[in-house]
From Swiss-Prot:
Residues annotated for UMP binding in this entry: G57, D77, T138, G139, N140, P141, F142, F143, T144, T145
Protein species of origin: Blochmanniella floridana
InterPro entries per record: AceGlu_kinase-like_sf (IPR036393), Asp/Glu/Uridylate_kinase (IPR001048), Uridylate_kinase (IPR011817), Uridylate_kinase_bac (IPR015963)
Activity modulation notes: Inhibited by UTP.
Function: Catalyzes the reversible phosphorylation of UMP to UDP.
Annotated localization: Cytoplasm
Gene: pyrH
Official protein name in the record: Uridylate kinase
Keywords annotated in UniProt: ATP-binding, Cytoplasm, Kinase, Nucleotide-binding, Pyrimidine biosynthesis, Transferase
Subunit structure and binding partners: Homohexamer.
Keyword Ribosomal protein tagged: no
Pathway listed: Pyrimidine metabolism; CTP biosynthesis via de novo pathway; UDP from UMP (UMPK route): step 1/1
Length: 243
């Protein structure tokens, strides 16, 4: 595809689930997916797109499952935060291998492992074309990485949040639950549409943050090669949610 000259977004917050990194593996990281992701990120960095990133930890730890068997929710969330740091370090190393400068910032102190989160420092790094990977969520239990992505996106003045999923966007019904049905894909929605139709885009805390700060949300399929770049260059892909 021949792309338009200039990206429509100059600074983005990219949210990748741990599940997306896991790919077809039973646990951990699928190296082929990781390698493809970092090459796509490199391509965007090379055209001047500033990228903040948050990665979930579900490929390494699912606290919600252990809570059912008696684990304290706060402890489970703390372990989940550490899982996001682990994924962040994996991404940091993979970007380094393809000569993309990046920095990992943690919402909880991990001296000697990564930098402490500082929003002014993060903006400075982004402005100098470095990818910034935000780890440990918001640093507080009971908040999802979706909430962290919207919060950090607002703090760094991102133009939009991009949520990478395993489906092509937002559907009227879950296409994974109904694989043999012809379910309509919404190309564009308003925040109000999502609330009225009770569409499960992200948790309500995250969604309210984005809505209240007029932060567009793009939902797209991470397994669709080039999908992220197509959106950033102004082409229709996945679902966009705006006011």
């Amino acid at each position: 595809m021949e792309y338009k000259i200039n990206p429509i977004y100059r600074r983005i917050m990219l949210k990748i689930s741990g599940e997306a990194l896991q790919g077809t593996e039973n646990f951990g990281v699928d190296s082929s997916i990781l390698d493809r992701m970092v090459l796509e990120i490199k391509e965007l960095v090379n055209i001047g797109v500033q990228i903040g990133m948050i990665i979930g930890g579900g490929n390494l730890f699912r606290g919600s499952r252990l809570v059912q068997f008696g684990m304290n929710k706060v402890i489970g969330d703390h372990i989940g935060m550490l899982a996001t740091i682990m994924n962040g370090l994996v991404m940091h190393n993979a970007l380094h291998r393809v000569y993309v400068d990046s920095s990992v910032m943690s919402a909880i102190p991990l001296q000697g492992v990564c930098d402490n989160y500082n929003w002014m420092r993060a903006i400075d790094l982004l402005s100098n074309n470095k990818v910034v990977i935000f780890g440990a969520g918001t640093g507080n239990p009971f908040f999802t990485t979706d909430s962290a992505a919207c919060l950090r996106g607002i703090e760094i003045s991102a133009n939009a949040v991009f949520k990478a999923t395993k489906v092509d966007g937002v559907f009227a019904h879950d296409p994974i639950q109904y694989p043999n049905h012809n379910i309509a894909l919404y190309e564009q929605l308003s925040y109000q549409d999502v609330l009225q139709r009770e569409l499960k885009v992200m948790d309500l805390t995250a969604f309210a943050l984005a809505r209240d700060h007029n932060l567009p949300i793009h939902i797209f399929n991470i397994n669709k090669v080039g999908a992220l770049k197509r959106i950033i260059m102004g082409y229709r892909e996945g679902t966009v949610i705006t006011k």
